[in-house]
C-alpha cells in the first residue's frame, strides 16, 4: 500500500475587507485579504519539486469558497531557451538558464466551466482568474505574514490615466468586402485538416534600453514581466489551437541596437530589419516582439504588420509597456501577434459574446480575452490563402525539458496525445485520462489525420502554391504531411520569363510591382548602367563600407530599376533603398538576368545550369 502524506498549508479568509490599498497592480479601491491553503497529495518520502506540476488552492471570494486548480504551463519555454544581454562595453552575453522547474501555471475554478486562470507561483500567487464571468486579480501582500494575499475585481483597479490607447494599424473598414464566414468557405478536406492541425509559434521578446531604465536595470523584474505575458498569451491562443513557446529573450542592457523612437512605424521597420539581419542568424524563431517603455506616438501602444507570420523581416511587432498590469500588456501583445496572423481590427458587426474583443482597435478598460467571430474567420482565411510554413514546425517530444504531465495540452515523452483534463477534452481520438490514443485509432491531429485514422496514401495534404512548387500527398503511414518541397531551381517558369528559385519565380517586373505598384515595369538597360559606377547606392557588392561596381554582364543583378507607367520621350529611372537595410531594392537572388542566366548569391549573372 502506498502511504500518502497530505501536506496542508493553512489558508483562511482574513476577517477584513480593505477599502483602498496601493499594490503592484496599482491603486485598488476594494479588496479581500486571504491566506492560501494549498492541498497536495504526495507519496511518503517522495522528493518534492520546488514547483509541482499540478497544485490546488482553496479560498473564498465574496464569502463563497472556491477551489483553484493549477497546472504548470509545460512548453512555455523551448529546450534551447536563451537569454541575451550586453556588458557595459557592448559585448554580447548569451546564457541558457535552466527553466525546467519554472513557476508559471494555467488553471480553472472548480465547477465553473467558463473559468480560466493565468498564475505565477514564484513568490506567492500572482495573476488573474475568471470567475462567473468576472475578472479577478490576486497578488501577495507585503506584510510580515508572508501568506497574506489580496484578491480584488479588475474593475476595482483605478485607471492609470484617462488617455485613449490604440493599436497603430490603420484600416478603413468600408473599403473591405464583408468577411466570408467560416461556414461559407468551401473548404476541401485537405484544407479542413490543415485548419484543424495544431500550430506552434516560437517567440523571441526583446526588451529595449528604456525598459532597462524603467525597471532600474533589474533584469529579474523584466524577465518576470515577460514570462507572465507569455503565460497569458498561451492561454489566449488556445482558442486558435496555437501553442506559443518562448525560445529567447534579449535585453538591450547597455544601449538600444536600433534607434527606438516614438514613431511606431519607423521603429517597427528598423526592428524588422535588425531581426532579419542579426537575430535570425543566431536564434531560430518564428516571430519577435519588441517590448518598449518609450511612449509611442499619440495614443498608439502597439503596431504589427498584418499577415506577415514567418516573414524574415515583417514577422514582428512592437508593444508599449503601458500598464502596471501584466494582463493588459499581454492582451496588447496578443492583439499585435494576431495582426501577424492575418487578423484585422473588428468592425461593429463582430461579436465576442458580450465580452470585450481582443481585436478592438481601441484598448478596452477591461482585459479582452476573446477573439470575435470576425477574427476567427479572418484567421482561417489567412491560413488557407498563405499557409505560413513556420507555424507547423512541431517541437520534438524530446525538446520538452520538464517531466511529462497528462492534461496540459502538450504531448510529452510517453504520451500519444494530450487534449487537456477529462472535463475539457473534446478530442474523440484521445483518452484524456491516460493521454493515449483510444483503441482502434491511429492519430489525433495532423494534416494527414481524419476521423482518428491516417488519411489514405495519395491524398493531397499541401497544394502547390505556384508552378515552381510541388503538391505534397499523404503517405498513409503518418499523420504528418511530408516535408514541403518545390520544383528544381533553374526550371523555366512564367512562359520562360523567369526560372524557379526555392519555390518561386522571381522576375524583375514582379519585383518592380512589389515596390512601386501595378503600373510599374522593369526599366530599360540604360538605367542599369548606373550599377557600373559603383557609387552611392548603385553597385553589385558591398563589403563593410566598401562597395564594388557591377561588371557589364552583371549590371541587372545589382540595384533594381523600374519605370512607372508610360514614359514618353524621357526615362525616369526609379529605384529604392534603405539605410537601415542595405539589401532592400537590390535584385532578388535567382532572378533572370539574361537568356539562360540568373543572379547568384555574389550578384553575378551566371549560367542557370551551373548556378545551383
Curated annotation (Swiss-Prot):
Binding site for Ca(2+) 2: 405, 408, 410, 412, 415, 418
Keyword line: Calcium, Cell adhesion impairing toxin, Disulfide bond, Glycoprotein, Hemostasis impairing toxin, Hydrolase, Metal-binding, Metalloprotease, Protease, Secreted, Signal, Toxin, Zinc, Zymogen
Tissue and organ expression note: Expressed by the venom gland.
A GO biological process held by the record: proteolysis
Domain Peptidase M12B: 199-395
Molecular function (Gene Ontology), one example: toxin activity
Pfam families, sorted: ADAM_CR (PF08516), Disintegrin (PF00200), Pep_M12B_propep (PF01562), Reprolysin (PF01421)
Location(s), subcellular: Secreted
Cofactor binding summary note: Binds 1 zinc ion per subunit.
Protein name per the record: Zinc metalloproteinase-disintegrin-like 2a
Amino acid at each position: 500500500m502506498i502511504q500518502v502524506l497530505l501536506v496542508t498549508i493553512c489558508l483562511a479568509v482574513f476577517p477584513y475587507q480593505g477599502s483602498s490599498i496601493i499594490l503592484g497592480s496599482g491603486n485598488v479601491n476594494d479588496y479581500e485579504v486571504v491566506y492560501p491553503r494549498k492541498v497536495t497529495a504526495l507519496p511518503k518520502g517522495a522528493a518534492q519539486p520546488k514547483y509541482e506540476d499540478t497544485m490546488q488552492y482553496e479560498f473564498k471570494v465574496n464569502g463563497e469558497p472556491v477551489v483553484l486548480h493549477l497546472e504548470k504551463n509545460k512548453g512555455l519555454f523551448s529546450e534551447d531557451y536563451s537569454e541575451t544581454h550586453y556588458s557595459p562595453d557592448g559585448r554580447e552575453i548569451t546564457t541558457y538558464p535552466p527553466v525546467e522547474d519554472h513557476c508559471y501555471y494555467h488553471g480553472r475554478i472548480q465547477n465553473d466551466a467558463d473559468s480560466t486562470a493565468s498564475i505565477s507561483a514564484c513568490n506567492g500567487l500572482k495573476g488573474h482568474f475568471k470567475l462567473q464571468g468576472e475578472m479577478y486579480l490576486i497578488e501577495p501582500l507585503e506584510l510580515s505574514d508572508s501568506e497574506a494575499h489580496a484578491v480584488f475585481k479588475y474593475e476595482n483597479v483605478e485607471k492609470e490615466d484617462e488617455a485613449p490607447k490604440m493599436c497603430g494599424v490603420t484600416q478603413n473598414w468600408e473599403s473591405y468586402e464583408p468577411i466570408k464566414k467560416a461556414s461559407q468557405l468551401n473548404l476541401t478536406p485537405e484544407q479542413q485538416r490543415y485548419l484543424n492541425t495544431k500550430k506552434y509559434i516560437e517567440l523571441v521578446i526583446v526588451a529595449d534600453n528604456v525598459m532597462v531604465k524603467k525597471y532600474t536595470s533589474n533584469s529579474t523584474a523584466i524577465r518576470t514581466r515577460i514570462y507572465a505575458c507569455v503565460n497569458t498569451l498561451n492561454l489566449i491562443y488556445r482558442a486558435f489551437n496555437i501553442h506559443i513557446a518562448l525560445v529567447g529573450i534579449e535585453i538591450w542592457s547597455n544601449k538600444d541596437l536600433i534607434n527606438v523612437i516614438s514613431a511606431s512605424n519607423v521603429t517597427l521597420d528598423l526592428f524588422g530589419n535588425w531581426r532579419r539581419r542579426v537575430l535570425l542568424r543566431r536564434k531560430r524563431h518564428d516571430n519577435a516582439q519588441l517590448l518598449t517603455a518609450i511612449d509611442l506616438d499619440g495614443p498608439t501602444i502597439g503596431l504589427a504588420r498584418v499577415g506577415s507570420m514567418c516573414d524574415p523581416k515583417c514577422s514582428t511587432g512592437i508593444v508599449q509597456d503601458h500598464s502596471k498590469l501584466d494582463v493588459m500588456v499581454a492582451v496588447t501583445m496578443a492583439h499585435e501577434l494576431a495582426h501577424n496572423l492575418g487578423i484585422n481590427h473588428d468592425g461593429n458587426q463582430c461579436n465576442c459574446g458580450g465580452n470585450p474583443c481582443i481585436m478592438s482597435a481601441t484598448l478596452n478598460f477591461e482585459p479582452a480575452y476573446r477573439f470575435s467571430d470576425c477574427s476567427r474567420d479572418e484567421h482561417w482565411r489567412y491560413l488557407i490563402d498563405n499557409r505560413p510554413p513556420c507555424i507547423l514546425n512541431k517541437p520534438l517530444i524530446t525538446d520538452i525539458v520538464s517531466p511529462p504531465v497528462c492534461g496540459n495540452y502538450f504531448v510529452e515523452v510517453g504520451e500519444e496525445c494530450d487534449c487537456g483534463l477529462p472535463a475539457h477534452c473534446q478530442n474523440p481520438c484521445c483518452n484524456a485520462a491516460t493521454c493515449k490514443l483510444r483503441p482502434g485509432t491511429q492519430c489525433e491531429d495532423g494534416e494527414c489525420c481524419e476521423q482518428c485514422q491516417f488519411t489514405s496514401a495519395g491524398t493531397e495534404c499541401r497544394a502547390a502554391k505556384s508552378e515552381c512548387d510541388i503538391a505534397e500527398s499523404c503517405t498513409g503511414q503518418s499523420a504528418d504531411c511530408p516535408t514541403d518541397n518545390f520544383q528544381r531551381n533553374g526550371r523555366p517558369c512564367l512562359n520562360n520569363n523567369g526560372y524557379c528559385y526555392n519555390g518561386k519565380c522571381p522576375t524583375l517586373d514582379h519585383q518592380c510591382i512589389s515596390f512601386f505598384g501595378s503600373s510599374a515595369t522593369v526599366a530599360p538597360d540604360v538605367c542599369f548602367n548606373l550599377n557600373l559606377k559603383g557609387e552611392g547606392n548603385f553597385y553589385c557588392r558591398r563589403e563593410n563600407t566598401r562597395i564594388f561596381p557591377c561588371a557589364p554582364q552583371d549590371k541587372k543583378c545589382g540595384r533594381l530599376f523600374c519605370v512607372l507607367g508610360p514614359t514618353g520621350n524621357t526615362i525616369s529611372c526609379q529605384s529604392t533603398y534603405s539605410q537601415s537595410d542595405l539589401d532592400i531594392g537590390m535584385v532578388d537572388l535567382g532572378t533572370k538576368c539574361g537568356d539562360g542566366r540568373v543572379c547568384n548569391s555574389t550578384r553575378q549573372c551566371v549560367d542557370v545550369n551551373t548556378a545551383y
